[in-house]
């Protein structure tokens, strides 16, 4: 089984999607799912003394403008593990440019955590936490000499639109599994 190609994008897209976690919150190791084999590989250890502030992964059967699966960040109170599947509710869209490429990311919360039951949109997230996420992504490649431009945040509706677009981009690239 290759989770990138064989899992659905979610049980109720775009309201609830599957987040396939590659990197748990608190990690300095950057793992990536190998798109051909479905195995997880260590891409690199972060050059800077930063760690991921969220669980980080992809939405299965999506493709994005950076020529990779569509990224998703899930706010977790405790880290999960690589290759964990989380039913996640999109609440925002983080917009950034990575070395000249559009590299937007969905921000989501786990459906099965009652702590986040009232978090429906970006305005429900404390600004200090959004600033922390933005700071991480602005600086995490700095010691590699790569430039990241943070464009800011948009709400849940923007995230849902991009998820649907990313599913269509996947179908264009890989064909439909339906």
From Swiss-Prot:
The keyword Lipid metabolism does not apply. GO terms for cellular component: cytoplasm. Mg(2+) 1 binds at residues 66, 71, 103. InterPro entries: Pyrophosphatase (IPR008162), Pyrophosphatase_sf (IPR036649). Substrate binds at residues 30, 44, 56, 140. It catalyses: diphosphate + H2O = 2 phosphate + H(+). It comes from the Archaea. SUPFAM superfamilies: Inorganic pyrophosphatase. Its EC number is 3.6.1.1. HAMAP family: Inorganic_PPase. Homohexamer. This is Inorganic pyrophosphatase.
